[in-house]
Amino acid sequence: MPDLKKVRAVLIGVGDKEANLIREQLYRCSFPFPKGSVADLGNLRKADAALLIPVLYELLSGKVLPIVIAGKDELARAQFLAYQEAKALVNMAVVDETFRADGVYAPLFKPRHPQLFHFALAGFQVHLTPPEAMGFLTKSHFDLVRLGKSKANIEETEPVLRDADLLTFHLGALKQCEAPGVANPSPSGYFAEEACQLCRYAGMSDKLTSFGLYGFQPEADRDGLTAQTSAQMLWYLLEGLFNRKGDYPASTSGLTEYVVDFRKLNYQLTFWKSAKSGRWWMQVPVATKRKHERHRLVPCSYQDYQLACREELPERLMQALERF
């Protein structure tokens, strides 16, 4: 592996054709990022999780952001498993059109992986998602953001992504007109601009340590459209990365405190606002175990704070309180 001392992000292809087509489009984009800050490690010699996991672990250990480009959706699970050696509890976010209890992520839930602290699913479509899968995620106090809600106010999806240590983005979450090169293209989904915005949000999160783009099927693509869309998404991920504000709250230093008297819950809720970015967090108002401390400040929005001032909380924050 090359010297990565000055590198902040690396591209890793898993599947030559898929990765190379996206690279070709990405290399056509402008590069306003610091010289030598992004490296390309090429492609793994085989699309195999057993090869991908140790590479990701080495990059995570070196505090370099791996960006995985893979055709097989199943490889998204390997991205999570790369965190096993770190022994820390991990928050995982997924952008996909559906979730199936017997799908890609099933081995992480049956039984629940001991390092999976929290899971979030954004952009899913109810008509494609089995009710039992939604019921399972809800009972587990995981975050669910329906496609319609996310598109209605894309900014409200930002806190969900900001809470993730790793994000897996499946191209099936986009409209067919934006990404036809997937296994099951759909007329509904995110527009390319919305997908790019989500990737930028993810890149800006100081908590995010790995990103994966999955599901590209080159043989189904049309005029290179999916490859172009994918490249734009990765470009905006990088733009977010190089615009990080360094306000991930390992401590509350540099944050402004707002205390809300929440009589319905019979205690006060504390919110924190970053002067650097204007972003908000809600503090879990109970004693937490040391292993949970890193997740105690839950990302939220100004709208969430305003609701709390009226003694209301969105379902997502109520679920967060239940997790501790």
Predicted segment positions?
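Conserved alpha-helical scaffold segments that buttress catalytic/binding sites
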Residues: M1-L213, Q217-F324
